[in-house]
């Protein structure tokens, strides 16, 4: 069974250590504060709105393989070249090297919300790494 760890639980560090020394994997809950969770929910709604745009609009922001950024149509990607194409569409973005021509302009605030989602994810990553740092007694300052 995969451990589910509430990061707001005062014993979360012990639960993480137990999970990763026994199972090697865990699912974290309550990882974000209320504001960040609300902001991420808004971003998920924004992404849903992007994928609901007409295909011709989404095609204005094509995936660029050399940068791994942009919009990929259904059946355009697959990790395993011997397998059928993935039946999904995606929009890959980045906060540091995303060219302006790949940011959709049809949705107000799309770029700002995308950048905010990266900031939230970065802070969450540091929070979780700091927890592992404390468990392992590395003494780092993240």
Regions found by a protein language model. Give the residues of each.
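Peripheral, non-catalytic segments flanking oxidoreductase cores
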Residues: 1-142
């Amino acid at each position: 069974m995969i451990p589910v760890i509430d990061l707001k639980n005062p014993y979360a560090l012990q639960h993480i250590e137990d999970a990763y020394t026994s199972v090697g994997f865990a699912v974290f809950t309550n990882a974000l504060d209320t504001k960040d969770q609300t902001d991420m929910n808004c971003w998920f709604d924004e992404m849903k709105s992007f994928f609901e745009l007409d295909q011709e609009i989404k095609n204005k922001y094509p995936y660029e393989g050399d940068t791994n950024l942009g919009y990929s149509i259904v059946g355009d990607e697959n990790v395993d070249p011997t397998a059928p194409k993935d039946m999904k569409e995606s929009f890959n973005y980045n906060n540091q090297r995303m060219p302006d021509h790949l940011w959709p302009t049809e949705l107000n605030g799309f770029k700002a919300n995308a950048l905010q989602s990266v900031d939230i994810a970065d802070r969450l990553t540091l929070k979780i790494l700091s927890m592992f740092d404390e468990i392992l007694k590395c003494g780092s300052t993240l």
